[in-house]
Amino acid sequence: ATDEKTPRTPKNAKERVRQSRPANEYSFVHSLVYLWYPPLFIAGPVMTFNDFAAQLDVPLYIPPRAIAGYMVRCIIALFSMEFMLHYMYVNAIKSARAWEGCTPMELGMIGLFNLEFVWFKLVIPWRVFRLWALLDGVDAPENMIRAITNSPSALGFWRSWHRSYNQWVVRYVYIPLGGSRNQLLAM
């Protein structure tokens, strides 16, 4: 039987975010560990304190196969960006203003590939630092779960582009301001 003062650590990420931690975990030392955890501090995804503390309390088992698969995803993203930089000169075209005189279709393609370049430029560091956290046994939320061209709406784009920050804002700003009950304050 579990002690009423010590809640069980949930395995589900949504539960780990929502469930409060024991009062003694909301200390200055725990806050510093959370704030200065290197994989997430440098350039990793944003993680809620409750999720982080729950995983420190009861470390998750992350199968080596899942970590290896994620490592392959990081490598594929890196090589895809290298391929794009080597064969598609959209960044050079933009910087040198070589797009002057292009047809509207060509301008559209240059713009689209510039967006894809920005996506790669951001997804690679986020995935590398999340991989570092996974190797350390911390399952941080995945950012950019969709490609930029696979967002059906602005809301879908926001929820998937910087997903971990969206979850943090919902947990620490939107819900305390009243959530859907008080949309004027939550704007």
Predicted regions and their residues:
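Membrane-embedded transmembrane alpha-helical bundles that form the catalytic cores
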Residues: 1-187
